[in-house]
Structure formats: C-alpha cells, structure tokens
UniProtKB/Swiss-Prot annotation:
Protein's recorded name: Carbamoyl phosphate synthase small chain
Phylogenetic lineage: Bacteria, Pseudomonadati, Pseudomonadota, Alphaproteobacteria, Sphingomonadales
Enzyme class: ligase
MF (Gene Ontology): ATP binding; carbamoyl-phosphate synthase (glutamine-hydrolyzing) activity; glutaminase activity
Organism of derivation: Zymomonas mobilis subsp. mobilis (strain ATCC 31821 / ZM4 / CP4)
Pathway the protein acts in: Amino-acid biosynthesis; L-arginine biosynthesis; carbamoyl phosphate from bicarbonate: step 1/1; Pyrimidine metabolism; UMP biosynthesis via de novo pathway; (S)-dihydroorotate from bicarbonate: step 1/3
Keyword entries, A-Z: Amino-acid biosynthesis, Arginine biosynthesis, ATP-binding, Glutamine amidotransferase, Ligase, Nucleotide-binding, Pyrimidine biosynthesis
Assembly, per entry: Composed of two chains; the small (or glutamine) chain promotes the hydrolysis of glutamine to ammonia, which is used by the large (or ammonia) chain to synthesize carbamoyl phosphate. Tetramer of heterodimers (alpha,beta)4.
Function: Small subunit of the glutamine-dependent carbamoyl phosphate synthetase (CPSase). CPSase catalyzes the formation of carbamoyl phosphate from the ammonia moiety of glutamine, carbonate, and phosphate donated by ATP, constituting the first step of 2 biosynthetic pathways, one leading to arginine and/or urea and the other to pyrimidine nucleotides. The small subunit (glutamine amidotransferase) binds and cleaves glutamine to supply the large subunit with the substrate ammonia.
Active-site residues annotated for this sequence: C264 (nucleophile), H348, E350
Annotated gene: carA
Region ranges (CPSase): 1-183
Pfam families linked: CPSase_sm_chain, GATase
Domain Glutamine amidotransferase type-1: 187-374
C-alpha cells in the first residue's frame, strides 16, 4: 500500500489482485469483520483492523449488512488461516477474492494506526500482484490525484434503485432470521443512503412495517407510500454533498411534522436540514466500544461508531437540542428537535457489530409515531 505522502507499506497480499484507491482508516472492533466489510458506509475506504486476528471464523451469508462488500480492502496483522466456525461457508481470503476486494497481511497495524491517528485519514492505494511487480511512482500519483471523500456524494451509488418491503427480524441461534408480519404496525419508510440490514431488522422487531426507498426519492415519492414515520439511514461520503438532494426532502417532511429518526449520515442530514453544519474529522470514529453520554440522565451507553464526518455542535440552531456526546472527544453524538417530532444519533444503535445498549432508540421511534399519529 502506498500513501499520498509517498510512504510505502509492504505486506503479503491476499484476495483479489490489482489496485484500488481510497481513504485508509482504522477500525478497533475485535469482532464483526464481515459486518464491517459489507457496511455500505465503508464505500471508497480501506480498513486497517487494529485487532490482529481477522478471518478466523471465515464468512457466511448471515453476518452481512449488504448484498456485497463495500470496503475496498483491508489491512491485517496476521495471515488469514483456515476458518474454525460451524457457520462458515468461505475462507475470508476467498470471500474477498470473489468480491474483487484486496487484503494485505503481515503489516504492523498498530504502527499504521499511530500514523493515521497523528496525520489523520489518508488517501492511499492498496495493490496486490503475486509477482510483486508494482509501478510505485504511478501508484503514488494515483493516491495523490484522488479527490478524497470531502465533497463526494457516495450515497446514490450504494443505494437501492427500486423500492422494496422488508419483513426480516433479528437473528437467533436457534432459528436464524425470523420473518415478522407487521401489517398492522406503523408504516416506516426508510430512505436508503447506504442502509445496513440490521437497522431494518430492528425497525421490524420494534413493530414497524418497513418500506425502503432510494436515496434520491422525492418528497412525493416518499409520501406515495403513506408513511407514518420516515427513517434516514446511514451511508458513505460527505453529508454536505448528499444534502443537495436529501435536505430539500427532509425539510418538506419536517414541514408536515412527519416523525423522523436518523442514524449516522441520516443524523448529519437532519442537522443540515435545520441549518447546522458538518465537518470532516481528523481521523473519524470507527469501533465497537465508543462511550457516549446521554445528557438527559448522564447515563453512559457503549456504542458502535463508524463515521468520518460530524455535526458541529456550536452550529445547532435553537430548536435542535443536543442529546448525546462522545466521551472520547466531546463531539455531538445525538440531537432532538424541540419543535418537530424528529431525533437522530451519530452512532449505530443497531450495532452489528457492537453492543446493544442503544436498541431502545428503535422503540422510542415507534412510540413517537404512536404519539404523533395515533
């Protein structure tokens, strides 16, 4: 792998061959690499896993957050070995190869993490050639010429193109994923800016009937489904770029006092819709053990996070009340509107991977819908 500043990081390639350019970042979760690699929020990113053993349980069809892998590749400390898990269907390296994703093993991932922590997320090219033949100057130039995530709208590239209904509930060891019929439940329309499947599962488990629409759906297209509430999903890229088509729709929904719940990118878009601003973080928050303080009662939730942009707390208008703060750096982790039935969080209450401290937010959304639209 080569960084835009010319630094080279050598390792043992696995997965697909070729080269891919994107932003390299680090993720501190000890488990859940399947969920992480398939999370659409990681589009155009290369993941440096801080935990040394990645791939040891292989890959399967159940522990994924999308139909394909969205991260461009990954960097790991130890070589990928044969999986040891009764649910495994593929070796991790074979899984990456089948989805045209590149891996790099044998890297001092702690040193790379230290570099990224100091210098911030970096543009990089990850390359794999079994013969070890690389045009280093060309790779460096590719990394330097890549525009970067700032100003980039990636939501429409990972979003669904057609609306669909979702009935799958959360997974259990005995029964796998359940199918839940919530025809009498409140109808939630989820706008897909890069939806994770486990968000949809938690909405269903909370009692919602769920319909998913594309990121670029207009206000009329959303309302054609007669929603009782609208969910704004997570997703990749710069929220300010996605806002060009998303914010006008959200503002129209706010005007009719539609109950709204946003997660991650959805949180940022809700903030932009009420006049706040967002910024690119130095290194971002990516892990499954991030403590968040709930301001209403000072309780702490351990959360899963994955974002490289954030909402500027001091830009919030009077009607947007901060509800959660990151205990790592004090950045905004949640907000609630005082004049509209809308709230959002920067972190991932659906986890996958991560703790389940914040599952209650899905129930809160359904309760809000019941209150506003009895």
């Amino acid at each position: 792998m080569v960084l835009a500043d010319g630094q080279m990081i050598w390792g043992r390639g696995f997965g697909a061959t070729g080269a891919k350019v994107g932003e390299v970042c680090f993720h501190t979760a000890m488990t859940g690499y399947e969920e992480i690699m398939t999370d659409p929020s990681f589009a155009s990113q290369i993941i440096n896993f801080t935990f040394p053993h990645i791939g040891n349980v292989g890959a399967n069809r159940e522990d994924v957050e999308a139909k394909t892998l969205h991260a461009l590749g990954c960097i790991v400390r130890e070589d990928v070995t044969a999986p040891s898990n009764f649910r495994s269907l593929w070796r991790f390296d074979s899984w990456l190869k089948d989805h045209d994703r590149i891996g790099l093993a044998g890297v001092d991932t702690r040193a790379l993490t230290g570099l990224l922590r100091k210098k911030g997320a970096q543009n990089a090219v990850i390359a794999h050639d079994p013969k070890g033949q690389f045009d280093i100057p060309a790779l460096i130039e590719t990394a330097r010429s890549w525009a970067g995530l700032q100003g980039m709208d990636l939501a429409r590239s990972v979003s669904t193109h057609q609306s669909y209904n979702w009935q799958e509930g959360i997974w259990s060891l005995q029964n796998g994923y359940s199918v839940v019929d919530n025809q009498k439940g409140p109808h939630v329309v989820a706008i897909d800016y890069g939806l994770k499947h486990n968000i949809l599962r938690n909405l269903v488990e909370a009692g919602a009937r769920v319909t998913v629409v594309k990121a670029t759906a207009s206000f009329d297209e959303v309302m054609a489904h007669k929603p009782d509430g609208v969910f704004l999903s997570n997703g990749p890229g710069d929220p300010a770029a996605t806002a060009e088509y998303a914010v006008p729709v959200i503002r129209q929904l706010l005007d009719i006092k539609m109950p709204i719940f946003g997660i991650c990118l959805g949180h940022q878009l809700l903030a932009l819709a009420v006049g706040a601003t967002t910024y690119k973080m130095h290194q971002g928050h990516r892990g499954a053990n991030h403590p968040v303080k709930r301001l209403d009662d000072s309780k702490v939730e351990i959360t899963s996070m994955n974002h490289g942009f954030a909402v500027a707390t001091d830009s919030l208008p009077e009607q947007a009340r901060p509800t959660h703060l990151s205990l790592f750096d004090g950045s905004l982790a949640g907000l609630e509107l005082t004049d509209r039935p809308a709230f959002s969080v920067q972190y991932h209450p659906e986890a996958s991977p991560g703790p389940q401290d914040s599952y209650y937010l899905f129930t809160k959304f359904i309760d809000l819908i019941a209150k506003e639209r009895p």
